[in-house]
């Protein structure tokens, strides 16, 4: 299982780096992201040491999909720098160029990849952080 998780993390990080090498893909159309649109409050439950509430917002930004991740209610949301749909999964990337600031860990900017799957009224999330072997997991419901 650990090997699978590492392979998933490597694949996700390659997906982040690959668009720069082969050119950007077309922006995601809101009609193709309809199940994901909204504000989702996610209770991160695994691993237990990282329990907490995250908010994922996905919206129609003038004909393209935009998204943000807020990991703490006391800090501003961070806008996703990459948004891709792969089958029933929405993949968000937050790079060192994220606005208003990149995600930080131990004072250093880090990349983050968030995969989300909507199952009925529930969004299931896995969050992978650069330089970490831990995959954070959680689930939550749409708030609007």
Give residue ranges: language-model regions.
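Central antiparallel beta-sheet cores of small beta-barrel/beta-sandwich binding domains
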Residues: 24-118, 126, 133-134
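Short, solvent-exposed mixed-charge patches
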Residues: 24, 141-144
């Amino acid at each position: 299982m650990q090997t699978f998780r590492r392979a998933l993390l490597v694949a996700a990080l390659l997906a982040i780096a690959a668009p720069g090498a082969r050119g950007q893909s077309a922006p995601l159309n809101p009609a193709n992201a309809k199940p994901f649109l909204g504000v989702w409050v996610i209770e991160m439950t695994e691993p237990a040491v990282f329990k907490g509430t995250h908010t994922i917002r996905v919206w129609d930004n003038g004909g393209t999909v935009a998204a943000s991740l807020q990991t703490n209610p006391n800090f501003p949301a961070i806008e996703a720098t990459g948004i891709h749909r792969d089958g029933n999964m929405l993949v968000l990337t937050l790079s060192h160029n994220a606005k208003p600031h990149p995600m930080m860990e131990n004072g250093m900017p880090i990349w983050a990849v968030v995969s989300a799957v909507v199952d009925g009224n529930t969004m299931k999330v896995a969050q992978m952080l650069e330089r970490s072997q831990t995959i954070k997991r959680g689930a939550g419901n749409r708030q609007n």
